[in-house]
């Protein structure tokens, strides 16, 4: 139990690294870092994990008169390297930056004697772990996953049964994250869990943790298209500031290069624990970047994309069915692992952060209205759905990255939870008129029209294969 309690420090913004193992108990020492963790929420979910930044002040502890009788989790993989496609762009930009033999001045002097942070391209797409990054790095994806396992064990350990299923998509980094969490849970609870690998491909149809794969009408480029003819002044300001001290260099920096360097800052922090590239940017630069990135997210995966709610409804409907059938089901814990895209579409369909705004300004930062989808899905992001038993009544509440996010218009229960009868009405209204199969024209690629793996995993063999991405 001591090891679990100590590891919780890492899940509330303080990171810890194992230093010894005595009598089976792992002890943790706080790992100091020069990294400014306050910028993590501004990096569009590409940097290390952080708590959800907007808290209503609601205690995350279970209300005194209640117990948790059923819990679900939908989690993103832990911290990773850039994808192969983004990594190639970074290498091309690095080639452009390093071809100059002179000295950079001003903010760009970080590139004097700089060494590219990915030592081998084979690491692209992969989870960061102690075999390929400095073990003292507090933000390694493997560490985040191990700590998450301890967090789950501490909060929900008494709900587990032996051979409890855990569900992961077949992506390599997602599967590896799930394995680290499972290993941590098995060690803490002395049980054996049953890992189910749900295939990521378009033929899976609705029986998937990644239902966007089978949505033939989904346009994932809608966010980029919204920006197609836009000029973002903040990028011009950054470029002018950098080049003012380097006017002698024959260097052409495009706006895409500047945005890519924010990504660079995030991913290098995942890999090395810190990044000098982050020092290129002033805080206001990152505030503007975060705003425009979340506008892109809104149209790419959020309520601004007409297919987000149909896609997200697959997992919302499955979650709701698990809740309503909780008394009859053998398992009380349902853990699932997927990607940020799928979680953002789930949140969009669920409506937890939907403020009703349908269009955003590209001329200036619209602080009052932006939906911060990236706050839901940092690396290692997770959403817990709890069903509480309080006396003779049941209630539902959501915990996003360790912060209670109330169900809109449904907060009359203990700890601002939602009475189950009112929750039924809320979900019915959210899903009314939404049909994933017809909206997505799923039957072009698959005849599978329902999600069944939560119910038939004992009869159907869900075992991958696992991809390298």
Curated annotation (Swiss-Prot):
Residues 1-16 form the signal peptide. Induction: Repressed by inorganic phosphate. Gene3D superfamilies: Phosphoglycerate mutase-like. It is found in: Secreted. It holds the Pfam family His_Phos_2. It catalyses: a phosphate monoester + H2O = an alcohol + phosphate. The active site is at residues 77, 340. One of its GO terms (cellular component) is extracellular region. It comes from the Eukaryota. Its main location: secreted. Glycans are attached at residues 23, 31, 129, 201, 229, 250, 317, 392, 447. Glycosylated during secretion across the membrane. Keywords: Glycoprotein, Hydrolase, Secreted, Signal. GO terms for molecular function: acid phosphatase activity. Its EC number is 3.1.3.2. It is an enzyme of class 3 (hydrolase). Belongs to the histidine acid phosphatase family. This is Repressible acid phosphatase. It comes from Kluyveromyces lactis (strain ATCC 8585 / CBS 2359 / DSM 70799 / NBRC 1267 / NRRL Y-1140 / WM37). The gene is PHO5.
